[in-house]
Structures are given as structure tokens and as C-alpha cells.
Curated annotation (Swiss-Prot):
Family: Belongs to the MnmA/TRMU family.
Principal location class: cytoplasm
Gene3D superfamilies: Adenine nucleotide alpha hydrolases-like domains, HUPs, Translation factors
GO cellular component: cytoplasm
Annotated GO biological process: tRNA wobble position uridine thiolation
Active-site residue list: 103, 200
Official protein name in the record: tRNA-specific 2-thiouridylase MnmA
EC number: 2.8.1.13
Site (Interaction with tRNA): 128, 344
Entry-linked SUPFAM superfamilies: Adenine nucleotide alpha hydrolases-like
Disulfide bonds: 103-200
The UniProt record lists the keyword Disulfide bond: yes
Species of provenance: Streptococcus gordonii (strain Challis / ATCC 35105 / BCRC 15272 / CH1 / DL1 / V288)
């Protein structure tokens, strides 16, 4: 057995099964493991139970079982300043943000990594489904997780080479059922715990109610592109491009009984545009532009590449041509794409490798900007 005992790995433990098994595997491989619970949000639920307290109890139980020290660290201020303020600003601007991308970039692999280094960490590890491979030049490449259904490189696309150099993803070569069975075989306290879903700071709460606590809703008119008034919308921030449910229109108003979708927004007029048909013309675009474009390794200031891309999590890859200039990019699609949503991440791949990504600013149809914000 290689002597890993001199290598300290600090594991981000959430109280879930994935991070529990991450800590277990590293401990079994002989590393000097420390578990850290990050408290990023003050989240008392409607029954007055702080879910973070429950999760921390699970971290403590698992850490005791596998015999590692554990601590809790509070990143509520950093999370509020670097993730939540961004989340609200994006909604104010009529966009649909992806807080998980920002949380990984700013908290899990920045604030947490910085903290871990003060504990003498050689590496940090998380329960993400992704893989890191080091080439002969010492460059770290981020590859998709083996479990295609769970691959999380989309959310990790803003990580830098410096961050990846210090990162381990022990679950990357496993599929989710294998992770559960490892937890069950080891009798871990979290083996049967269900996966958390949704945005971390909202949890099981109603999204509309949550958002309205921070941003006052501004109801307005719901219109077709032809100018027909379809009623009132509850506030542009509650709707995302391509959304079907929650419009309150049903099959009415249309002669062909096709379902209705959100096909555009006009922030200045506070109008929500709706139209019939999954592939409504206004939902289809041929290119996008992105900002905050970033790659996992150093790239030229200006270049063009052919690769594949994802425009949302768990979507099949699409072929694209990317023209990069500084931290901006124009992405041209080989085939028209549906519901490209400003605020979401566009992530680039070369085969199994995640190259990086950016945040979508606008979608275009044959050179003309789509009215999505």
C-alpha cells in the first residue's frame, strides 16, 4: 500500500451519502482525513427545525464511525455576499441564475479550499460525480463522472487549474447505486438518507414564496407575440424560458389545443410572452453569447474551437463552434437549440473532458437577438 498517511485530505461533508462515502474511501486508502461541515445558510424550516443542525449530526455520526476528526465552519457571510446576492441580482435582471455553479466556484472550491489549506490540507475532496486526471506535464484535466446520470461537471465548469490541482473526486469512477451499497455495507448512518434536491438554500420550500421574501413581485400582462392579452403574470422572475406549467392558460385561447409555453420576456415593459407549441419559433435559436467565460487551463486571449456543449444540466451534448475573445464568447450551434436561457451556464466538452464554460447572456436567431430578458 502506498503511504498516503502523510497526505492530508479535507473532505467537505454535507451529511449526505455521497460525501460520507467520499470520506470513508479516503480513510480506507490510508489518507489523513478531516471532515468539515460547511454551514452556508441559516435555514430554519417552517417547523422551527434547523436542517443544518440535523445534517451536522449526521456528519458527526459518520465521522465517528469511520474514525476521523470533524469540524463545522460557518460560511454564511461569504455565501450571502458571493452567491445569494448574485442569485437575486440575476432574477432582478430577468435572468435565471444557476447558484450551484457559483457556489462551487466561490464557496466549495474557494472559501472552503482556503480554510482547508489553513488546516494543512494537501487536497480537498467532495462527493461530486466528476473525475480529475493529471497528465505527464502535471496539468489536471476534469473528466465527466462515470455515472452519466449523475455527472456534475456542468456545475464544476468554473473551476480553475489552481483549484483542480488541489481537488480529489473519489466518487468519479463509481455509479450512484455502488455508492449506496458501499455506505450500506459499511453501516454508515447516512446509507439510507435520501438525496437532497433543489437549490441548497431553498430546500423543500416553495420557490415562489421564498423568492417573494427577497424580491417584491411585480405582476404584469401576459401576451402573445401577436399582441393578444392572455391575462396576468405573477412577476417575471417566477418564469423561465421554455417553461410550460404555472401559466394558468391551459388549452384555452388556441384553436389547436397545443400547450402554452413561456417564449419571451420584456423587462422594460414587464410583459411575459407566451406561445403555443414545444418547438415554438421564438424558443429556437442558432447562437448565443456568453460572459465570464473561463477554461480549466490557460488558453490564448482569442481563439476559435469546435467542441460540444451543454446549455443545461443533464442535457445531451450538442455540436458547437466557439469564438472566444477574453472572457466573452460567441457560441454557434450546428443545429438550432430550444429554450436557451440567459443566466444559465454554457459548458464546453471535448469528448469526456470538461473544458470550462461561461454564463449565457443572450440567444440569437439568425443573428437577431431573442427577446428573453
Amino acid at each position: 500500500m502506498s503511504d498516503n498517511s502523510k497526505t492530508r485530505v479535507v473532505v467537505g461533508m454535507s451529511g449526505g451519502v455521497d460525501s460520507s462515502v467520499t470520506a470513508l474511501l479516503l480513510k480506507e486508502q490510508g489518507y489523513d482525513v478531516i471532515g468539515i461541515f460547511m454551514k452556508n445558510w441559516d435555514d430554519t424550516d417552517e417547523f422551527g427545525v434547523c436542517t443544518a443542525t440535523e445534517d451536522y449530526k449526521d456528519v458527526a455520526a459518520v465521522a465517528d464511525q469511520i474514525g476521523i476528526p470533524y469540524y463545522s465552519v460557518n460560511f454564511e457571510k461569504e455565501y450571502w455576499d458571493r452567491v445569494f446576492e448574485y442569485f437575486l441580482a440575476e432574477y432582478r435582471a430577468g435572468r435565471t441564475p444557476n447558484p450551484d455553479v457559483m457556489c462551487n466556484k466561490e464557496i466549495k472550491f474557494k472559501a472552503f479550499l482556503d480554510y482547508a489549506l489553513t488546516l494543512g490540507a494537501d487536497y480537498v475532496a467532495t462527493g461530486h460525480y466528476a473525475q480529475v486526471k493529471r497528465d505527464q506535464d502535471g496539468l489536471v484535466h476534469m473528466l465527466r463522472g462515470k455515472d452519466n446520470n449523475k455527472d456534475q461537471t456542468y456545475f464544476l465548469s468554473q473551476l480553475s487549474q489552481e483549484q483542480l490541482q488541489k481537488t480529489m473526486f473519489p466518487l468519479g469512477h463509481l455509479e450512484k447505486p455502488e455508492v449506496r451499497s458501499i455506505a450500506e455495507r459499511a453501516g454508515l448512518a447516512t446509507a439510507k438518507k435520501k438525496d437532497s434536491t433543489g437549490i441548497c438554500f431553498i430546500g423543500e420550500k416553495n420557490f415562489k414564496e421564498f423568492l417573494s421574501q427577497y424580491l417584491p413581485a411585480q405582476p404584469g400582462r401576459m401576451m402573445t407575440l401577436e399582441g393578444r392579452d392572455m391575462g396576468q403574470h405573477a412577476g417575471l422572475m417566477y418564469y423561465t424560458i421554455g417553461q410550460r406549467g404555472g401559466l394558468g392558460i391551459g388549452g384555452q385561447h388556441g384553436g389547436d389545443n397545443e400547450p402554452w409555453f413561456v417564449v419571451g420576456k420584456d423587462l422594460s415593459q414587464n410583459i411575459l410572452y407566451v406561445g403555443q407549441g414545444f418547438y415554438h419559433d421564438n424558443l429556437m435559436s442558432t447562437s448565443l453569447d456568453a460572459s465570464q467565460v473561463h477554461f480549466t487551463k490557460e488558453m490564448p486571449e482569442e481563439f476559435t474551437m469546435e467542441c460540444t456543449a451543454k446549455f443545461r444540466y443533464r442535457q445531451p451534448d450538442s455540436k458547437v463552434t466557439v469564438h472566444v475573445k477574453g472572457d466573452k464568447a460567441e457560441v454557434i450551434f450546428a443545429e438550432p437549440q430550444r429554450a436557451i436561457t440567459p443566466g444559465q451556464a454554457v459548458v464546453f466538452y471535448d469528448g469526456e473532458e470538461c473544458l470550462g464554460g461561461g454564463l449565457i447572456d443572450n440567444a440569437y436567431r439568425d443573428g437577431k437577438v431573442c427577446q428573453y430578458v
